[in-house]
Design a protein with these regions (language model features):
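Peripheral, non-AAA+ core regions of ATP-driven protein-machinery
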Residues: 2-12, 16-77, 84-92, 97-104, ...
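Conserved RecA-like ASCE P-loop NTPase motor core of nucleic-acid helicases/translocases
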Residues: 117-121
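Conserved Walker A/P-loop ATP-binding site and its immediately adjacent core
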Residues: 122-128
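General small-molecule cofactor/ligand-binding pocket signal
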Residues: 144-146
């Protein structure tokens, strides 16, 4: 006979305990336990079960993952080349960032190719979804809508009429009737995700699930939600700005270094095929503290503008603020400048920003940050046709970075004439005739 009992769950890792604890033994996080009531049924007898026999790894046949296009090249890039049959993809992001919009556009393209799509919404009515869809464009009859909150209703329909792709918007609004807890609770999210994963693998259906995020920027619910799915995508960007960055945090079928760039318009999200041109639009010329760097996001080189402002502080402790860059990394470079270059920055405020709302983690941006800080400190504008990249060590040395040839080619394509790079990279380019020909349009190659 089924009965209810109280269990405490960790919101970060899903660790279960019979009592509340201040620190989770599983992930060592503090104050993450929440109380839930769960229904426990009688354990089934295992007498009639069939014995499970393991298979030798040499007898297992492998097959390449079958992929099909989403109709959005930027989304295909982040997914690793398209959608894999039987995959479970989690899409997270801030409210209003465009999660539902990009999935609706994907569904529109797939239905136009003749694929049957099931869009399940637990947050909006049919008319509300139709209003948003009309802004995007015309949909085909193979685009099916289902507004329910019970997972059993979804499973029942899928057994009758198997779709090619299922979209769940969102995972926090879908419940399983067998579990007596509120929607979005740890136990509900774990059970719903586990059953969706089983459905995807057994029926070879690609399933996309939308996840709400917390104020820390992580998907709401247990941390093991991200471990259960095949791919985790995050939408980044300012809701008040026009550009959105789609980044893969986890991908079992592709690289996690690729990004997709979109622009939010009235008609939906538009793909940005040349991010460098967009990110450098409106760049101020002959202004101190501004420099262009070439970052590598996966296999794609992107030119970005780094802006720095160094001014005399009016506080006892100088302020250091960064936007789009690692705060500790900028502080490290400020210390290197003061120790190795003799620049007295301990009495100055420093503000460093990436124009365009991008987040930059590439170590090759170190040299660009240094150039921007020195330019602002001395109030000397840099050459507007110059691109900089290179990693800076604690001893003040400039270290080589990967894919120097790709970075230079991107700079040439965008019309830049001067490239300052690590000496090791420059020597490698000079030894190759092919690389030399690619650099013929650069007027000056300076290695410092």
């Amino acid at each position: 006979m089924a009965k209810e009992k109280q269990i405490f769950f960790c919101r970060e890792c899903g660790f279960e305990s019979a009592k509340w604890m201040g620190q989770c033994p599983g992930c060592r996080s503090w104050n993450t336990f929440c109380e839930e009531k769960v229904t426990v049924g009688a354990r089934k007898q295992s007498g009639g079960r069939t014995a499970v026999v393991p298979t030798s790894i040499l007898e297992v046949k492998t097959a390449d993952e079958t992929r099909f296009s989403t109709g959005l090249e930027e989304l295909n890039r982040v997914l690793g080349g398209g959608i894999v049959n039987g995959s479970l993809v989690l899409v997270g992001g801030d409210p209003g960032i465009g999660k539902s919009t990009i999935l609706l556009q994907m569904c529109r393209n797939l239905s136009a190719d003749g694929h049957k799509i099931l869009y399940v919404s637990g947050e909006e009515s049919l008319s509300q979804i139709k209003m948003r869809a009309e802004r995007i464009g015309t949909f085909q009859k193979d685009m099916l809508l289902l507004c329910v909150n019970n997972l059993e209703d979804v499973e029942e329909y899928v057994k009758k009429d198997k779709p090619k792709v299922i979209v769940i918007d969102s995972i926090q609004t879908i419940v399983v009737e067998d579990i007596a807890s509120a929607p979005g609770s740890v136990s509900q999210v774990k059970e719903v995700t586990a059953r969706l994963m089983q459905m995807a693998k057994q029926m070879d259906i690609a399933i996309f699930i939308v996840g709400h995020v917390t104020k820390e920027g992580t998907v709401a619910g247990p941390r093991n939600l991200e471990h259960m799915v095949d791919t985790v995508l995050y939408f980044e960007g300012d809701r008040n700005a026009g550009f959105r960055i789609l980044r893969a945090v986890k991908n079992r079928f592709g690289s996690t270094n690729e990004i997709g760039v979109f622009e939010m318009l009235e008609t939906g999200l538009s793909e940005v095929n040349n991010p460098s041109k967009v990110m450098l639009a409106g760049r101020p010329l002959q202004t101190s503290g501004s420099v262009v760097v070439c970052s590598l996001e996966g296999t794609r080189p992107i030119l970005l503008e780094i802006q720095a402002l160094v001014c005399q502080t009016s506080f006892n402790l100088p302020r250091r603020t960064t936007v789009g860059l690692d705060y500790n990394r900028v502080n490290l470079l400020l210390a290197v400048l003061e120790k190795r270059a003799g620049m007295v920055l301990s009495g100055s405020d420093a503000y460093v920003n990436i124009a365009g709302g991008m987040r930059l983690d590439d170590p090759a941006a170190d040299l660009g940050i240094v150039f921007a800080l020195v330019s602002s400190f001395r109030n000397r504008p840099l050459d507007e046709s110059m691109v900089v990249f290179g990693e800076v060590g604690l001893s003040g040395e400039v270290r080589g970075v990967s894919a120097a040839e790709q970075r230079v080619r991107e700079a040439v394509k965008m019309g830049f004439r001067t490239c300052i790079m690590p000496k090791t990279n420059a020597e490698h380019l000079e030894r190759s005739e092919e690389h030399t020909s690619e650099l013929q349009s650069l007027e000056d190659l300076v290695c410092r």
